[in-house]
């Protein structure tokens, strides 16, 4: 026998054994388990008979009425089923259809359902309809809004324990009332005549000097003008009149008309022999700590010169140092 034939025999033997094991259980008959005898007849109670007859009569009466109200019941059931479907849909949507809101004061009041209105669906329009609508909108004149802002009075709350702030009420002046009356009469004229358009032109964006500097320059100009006029008048009288304001005149009259001491010498004693004239300066002639282009260039040139000099000094020192090393080496050899 071949190997395949042996396998087929083994399979057949296993299926037959399984069929023998899985035998159906015998069905249980109700008659075998009944304790009463087969020929037993149960006697009915007269009260039970009466109740059965009354029940049968009621059923007959209700049957005649049921035929008439059958159509109405069908209609009612259809409407009730629709309501149930709507409620189920609302529950499925997550309760978006009906929401309950509670008022502030009524904590124990029953909840009132607030129906939320669904937005209307947007109508789909073709391209031609949209173009027509745009043309109609162009033909219609634009609505001009009033430029005067509407001022709303803010609500004022009176709190207990706080002083009531008295706000000054603006009284209409008689001039304003007259203007209002006159403007009412001339409103037609103003509407006809177009108002001139005012353009905000850009101002000159160039840099301007500081305010203090400007004032100093103007004061200098004024002083120079007065001084020039005064010098012209004095030039005619210089030949035969000695000026009292001249420095030479003051130096001559120091010892004669002065207080008996020289202030410049005293000032030099306390300032290490320096003259007082070296420190005389005008406040207006003082620098403003602002360097010009020429000053910057001069400083750069000076810095370059100093750097070159330092480089030359370093090179000379290095050369000397190397020469000294060579001499020492030669002397050792």
Curated annotation (Swiss-Prot):
Compositional bias (Low complexity): 180-193
The entry's keywords: Acetylation, Activator, Coiled coil, DNA-binding, Nucleus, Phosphoprotein, Repressor, Transcription, Transcription regulation
Positions with biased composition (Polar residues): 1-20
Domain notes: The acidic C-terminal domain mediates interaction with histone H3/H4 complexes.
Function according to Swiss-Prot or TrEMBL: Histone chaperone that stabilizes pre-existing histone tetramers and regulates replication-independent histone exchange on chromatin. Required for normal chromatin refolding in the coding region of transcribed genes, and for the suppression of spurious transcription. Global regulatory protein that plays positive as well as negative regulatory roles in transcription.
Further information: Present with 1240 molecules/cell in log phase SD medium.
Quaternary assembly: Interacts with tetramers formed by histone H3 and H4. Interacts with SAP1 and CDC23. Component of the SAGA complex, a large multiprotein complex that modifies the chromatin, at least composed of SPT2, SPT7, SPT8, SPT20/ADA5, HFI1/ADA1, ADA2, ADA3/NGG1, TRA1 and GCN5.
Name this polypeptide is given: Protein SPT2
